[in-house]
Amino acid sequence: MGAITGVDGVDVVIGTSSFLREFSHGKDMAYITKTAIEVIEFVKTKGIEVRFSSEDSFRSDLVDLLSIYQTVDKIGVNRVGVADTVGCANPRQVYDLVRTLRGVVSCDIEVHLHNDTGMGKASKTLLVRLFTLLGQLLPTHTQR
């Protein structure tokens, strides 16, 4: 819908953790990947920016997560987003995931953190300090 209403960009978001796959939408990673490709390719035909984000990134299987990010990067998303949907990731986990992701995608990386446990602000501070030299890391957004 956003692609036909004149927006500048669209965020394609789907839950990738086993929790969300089982209790939210009931889809497996093959279905998620196939659907993401179809939606991203459609959005790209509209000439607008497209970001792919996984919901609940930090409780998702790392192999699954990196695989889908690599796939959407290859088809040309402008950026990928990782989300600490429930505010459970500590700064080291955020650093490790973003650093690993930087090694498998060439697009921009965006980080979305929640501060439920107080880790969002700490993670944001760490990311700003550690990734200043790496480039292509977009500013983080912390929600309470």
Segments the model singles out, each with a brief description of its role:
Residues 1-109, 124-132:
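Alpha/beta enzyme core
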Residues 73, 112-114, 118, 122-144:
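Active-site capping/gating regions of soluble enzymes
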